A protein has these predicted regions:
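A short interface-forming secondary-structure element
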Residues: 41-61, 87
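N-terminal presequence-like segments and adjacent domain-start helices
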Residues: 1-28, 32-41, 62, 70-89
Length: 89
């Protein structure tokens, strides 16, 4: 596998891991409003479909941030942003 393909594969694996992890640790209605998640350079960025859901998600993430960091030891920052459905990260 080429280095680029390896990096992309690892990135997809991390997105899949975090999406499943968040689905399991957030309330079902909130997990359904996630539009993406990206782990990059020690930062975990969680995307919500609207600004209203982003605000609610920020509070929920604050409550589980210690668990997030325990599950991803390299995570030094967790943030929530808006990414409407159908938009590209």
């Amino acid at each position: 596998m080429t280095p680029t393909l390896t990096r992309v594969t690892e990135q997809v694996d991390r997105q899949t891991f975090w999406r499943g992890w968040l689905d399991a640790h957030l309330p079902a209605e909130m997990a359904g409003k996630l539009t993406g998640v990206v782990e990059r350079e020690g930062a975990l960025v969680i995307f919500a479909e609207s600004s209203a859901w982003s605000a609610r998600l920020r509070y929920a993430v604050q409550e589980i941030e210690a668990q997030i960091r325990a599950s991803g030891p390299g995570i030094t920052e967790v943030s929530v942003r808006v990414l409407p459905r159908g938009a590209k990260a």
